[in-house]
């Protein structure tokens, strides 16, 4: 190493030690959190009710919430929002029953840090720390336990929902069943979850990982299906299952097994990058993480999206404050980009076309997964993409019915959640891709959102679905065919007759 190189290394190391000493926000490490109790919750609900009453009649009702994990815009409003400032915690934990009562704006980061000391975890922990439990239930949250635990709303025992009438309505599999079944994937068009009672699952201290290399997506898909059906691979049980596709010739399944066996663990919260640790030329690569680090393995680098901010450059990473290696801070950078068009300005300065944001999660069945991946990798240069198999549970852990029959909804064991009708007994594979393409990828005269529209068409042609947390371009007729038909409108007549909340189509396509 040259003298200049040595001096640079010392300087970078010094800056890194200084920034690591800074305590910024929630940081990366576990915090000691206690349930807030019922009295504090009831006070927060009263504040929520008062803020609702203060919104002029005829005005749309929104949350007064600073953070979001939605990748679509929202029309600006000067009307004050709902005060949810006291609704961001766990209310109570019952370690004997394995349940928790949780406020709707509680982030999964806070939920995990509250219940993990009891030896429990939510049944599904979506990938990013600031996703809220209410957001995952009224939207969509997926992760590597979905192949055995279904989706977050399938862990629901009971909910209190602020409806468009200003009432807080309790719903469950046997009470106000239409609302209980209709709130998932409603994205705030019917109301907001104030309290959610959920089942938890026992977890062990560590996760043993096997990263299995494949050279084609057909072989990967076949193995994924076998694991979903059997819960094991090569004689070892599988508790967690997801995948990453870097190209059609380089793809991986990441298999996790819970264990209490002590031993060394890897750390991907500073210099090392988790998704890069997956890559290897052949066979199986093993790794170990603590259970908490496993649950948040994707948050540190926002899967792989942190590369857009320079944090995967070794020099920048060493100097970057450790506490800011988290998706919530990258979201702030995205906010600055949206406000000042930073990315488009950079492209223009380099004589390159502006970019069309392509941030989507879609689901197709395994039989159509290879076709979708082959089409996608031949159509754009976005890589890698994430895979997460999902299996709707249909019944509770004890075999009981998850949902009952409502006044509008009949008993439907195949499609218990009508606004996102994944079929019980059918494996679905979530495919996530979060990047951009040149706006002229499909031609200089291509309309806005051209590639996203092409994705929608391909997914529909394969009988799939698309999550609505990002931009959607469907016409109303197509949208209603895909997302609940007339049922959302029927529910609004009961729970939001004055239309205080924007409708599902208006919220997700028109950005109301």
Which residue ranges define each predicted feature?
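Glycine-rich N-terminal segment of FAD-binding domains in flavoprotein oxidoreductases
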Residues: 35-130, 136-145, 387, 459
């Amino acid at each position: 190493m040259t003298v200049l190189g040595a001096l640079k290394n010392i300087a970078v190391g010094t800056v890194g030690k200084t920034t690591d000493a800074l305590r910024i926000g929630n940081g990366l490490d576990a915090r000691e959190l206690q349930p807030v109790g019922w009295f504090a919750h009831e006070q927060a609900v009263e504040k929520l009710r008062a803020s609702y009453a203060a919104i002029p009649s005829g005005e749309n009702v929104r949350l007064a919430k600073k953070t979001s994990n939605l990748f679509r815009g929202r029309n600006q409003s000067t009307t004050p929002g709902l005060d949810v400032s006291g609704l961001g915690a766990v209310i109570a934990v019952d370690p004997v029953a394995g349940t928790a009562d949780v406020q709707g704006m509680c982030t999964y980061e806070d939920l995990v840090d509250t219940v993990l000391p009891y030896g429990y975890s939510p049944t599904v922990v979506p990938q990013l720390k600031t996703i809220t439990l209410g957001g995952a239930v009224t939207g969509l949250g997926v992760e590597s336990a979905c192949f055995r635990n279904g989706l977050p709303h399938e862990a629901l025992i009971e909910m209190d929902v602020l409806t468009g009438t200003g009432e807080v309505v309790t719903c469950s599999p046997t009470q106000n069943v239409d609302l209980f079944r209709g709130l998932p994937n409603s994205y705030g068009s019917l109301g907001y979850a104030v309290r959610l009672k959920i089942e938890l699952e026992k977890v062990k201290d560590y996760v043993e990982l096997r990263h299995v290399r494949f050279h084609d997506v057909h072989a990967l898909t076949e193995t994924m299906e076998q694991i979903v059906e059997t819960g094991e691979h090569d004689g070892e049980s599988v508790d967690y299952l997801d995948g990453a596709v870097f190209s059609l010739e380089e793809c991986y399944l990441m298999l996790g097994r819970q264990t209490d066996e002590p031993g060394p663990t890897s750390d991907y919260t500073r210099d090392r990058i988790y998704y890069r640790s997956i890559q290897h030329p052949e066979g199986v690569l093993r790794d170990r993480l603590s259970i908490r680090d496993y649950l948040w393995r994707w948050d540190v680098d926002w899967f792989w999206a942190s590369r857009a901010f320079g944090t995967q450059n070794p020099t920048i990473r060493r100097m970057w404050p450790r506490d800011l290696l988290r998706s919530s801070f990258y979201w702030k950078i995205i906010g600055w980009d949206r406000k000042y068009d930073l990315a488009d300005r950079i492209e223009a300065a380099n004589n390159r076309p502006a970019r069309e944001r392509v941030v989507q999660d879609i689901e197709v069945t395994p039989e159509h997964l290879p076709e979708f991946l082959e089409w996608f990798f031949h159509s754009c240069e976005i890589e890698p993409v994430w895979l997460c198999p999902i299996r709707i549970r249909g019944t509770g852990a004890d075999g009981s019915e998850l949902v009952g029959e409502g006044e509008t909804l009949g008993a439907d064991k195949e499609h218990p959640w009508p606004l996102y009708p994944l079929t019980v007994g059918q494996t679905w594979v979530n495919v996530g891709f979060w990047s951009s393409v040149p706006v002229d990828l499909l031609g200089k005269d291509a309309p806005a959102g051209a590639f996203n529209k092409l994705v929608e068409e391909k997914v529909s042609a394969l009988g799939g679905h698309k999550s609505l947390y990002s931009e959607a371009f469907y016409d109303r007729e197509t949208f209603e065919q895909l997302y609940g038909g007339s049922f959302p409108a029927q529910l609004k007549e009961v729970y939001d007759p004055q239309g205080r909340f924007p409708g599902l189509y208006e919220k997700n396509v028109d950005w109301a």
